[in-house]
């Protein structure tokens, strides 16, 4: 039976030979990332646009949204789309919130609870199945988390925990801790589960906000990194790793950080390969053309 167990929010100081040190060291270059390569810029940005749609679809899929890619693309291509279904609006809200973050949050800016609540309000706005009766307001009752043995804290303690979280991310720790703080803050938010619904979508938006806050150049190349891509690839692993961190042990929290930051590193490597025209032609475009040709032959 799910149960609540308090544990303090604090930094990790991994051993020098920890995998966490390795992944943090490799990711530090993201602060000064400048994309370049042999892929023509228009082609690269078109591909990134496609990935943005896939990432929004992936974020919604984690929450159980089963909209197909074809339906989502069709809704985006319509000049004057008909009234969006609840599931399509859910993804449109995510994209709108991502743009809001990029326009209204700058490196070094302090995070506020008001900003977090604003993200939540945008995420659930106009939704029925995955909406919230009180957009932007902390929950007033108990909630349970799907596939989790962790029971979030009582509603009366949510403001205290969220105030603590905001203070933690804004505290001027040495920059070497920034990436670790991004991962820890993601888990802590999920652990608190401050809203009645939409917590998963909101925390992934918060993670993107924190990367910008700490000066990581995630907006380069048309949003080079969206944390959603990390978590939507394997929903079961996402919940399993959250479960490890829920225990509050140093080992569990460190394993969570390695999972999150390792996923970011993998996504950056994928983007880097897209800037290589030879890789793009040989491994993506040519294979896609071959599959399309085979389908055409089969249809005949």
Q: Where do the protein language model's features map onto the residues?
A:
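FIC/Doc superfamily catalytic core
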Residues: 1-300
């Amino acid at each position: 039976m799910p149960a609540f167990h308090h544990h303090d929010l604090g930094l990790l100081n991994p051993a020098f030979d920890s995998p966490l040190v390795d992944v943090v060291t490799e990711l530090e270059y993201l602060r000064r990332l400048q994309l370049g390569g042999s892929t023509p810029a228009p082609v690269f940005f078109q591909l990134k646009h496609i990935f943005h749609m896939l990432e929004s679809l992936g974020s919604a899929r984690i929450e159980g949204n089963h909209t197909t890619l074809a339906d989502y693309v069709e809704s985006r291509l319509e000049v004057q789309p008909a009234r969006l279904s609840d599931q399509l609006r859910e993804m449109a809200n995510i994209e709108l919130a991502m743009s809001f973050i990029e326009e209204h949050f700058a490196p070094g800016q302090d995070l506020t609870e008001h900003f977090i609540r604003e993200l939540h309000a945008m995420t659930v706005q106009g939704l029925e199945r995955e909406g919230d009766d009180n957009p932007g307001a902390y929950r007033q009752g108990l909630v349970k988390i799907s596939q989790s043995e962790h029971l979030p804290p009582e509603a009366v303690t949510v403001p205290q925990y969220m105030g603590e979280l905001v203070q933690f991310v804004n505290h001027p720790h040495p920059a070497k801790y920034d990436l670790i703080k991004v991962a820890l803050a993601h888990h802590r938010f999920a652990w608190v589960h401050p809203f009645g619904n939409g917590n998963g979508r909101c925390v992934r938006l918060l993670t993107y906000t924190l990367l910008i806050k700490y000066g990581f150049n995630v907006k380069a190349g048309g949003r080079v990194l969206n944390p959603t891509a990390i978590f939507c690839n394997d929903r079961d692993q996402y919940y399993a790793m959250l479960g490890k961190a829920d225990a509050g042990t140093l080992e569990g929290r460190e394993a969570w950080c390695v999972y999150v930051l390792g996923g970011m590193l993998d996504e950056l490597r994928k983007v880097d390969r897209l800037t290589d025209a030879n890789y793009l032609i040989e491994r993506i475009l040519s294979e896609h053309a071959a599959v399309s040709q085979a389908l055409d032959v089969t249809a005949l």
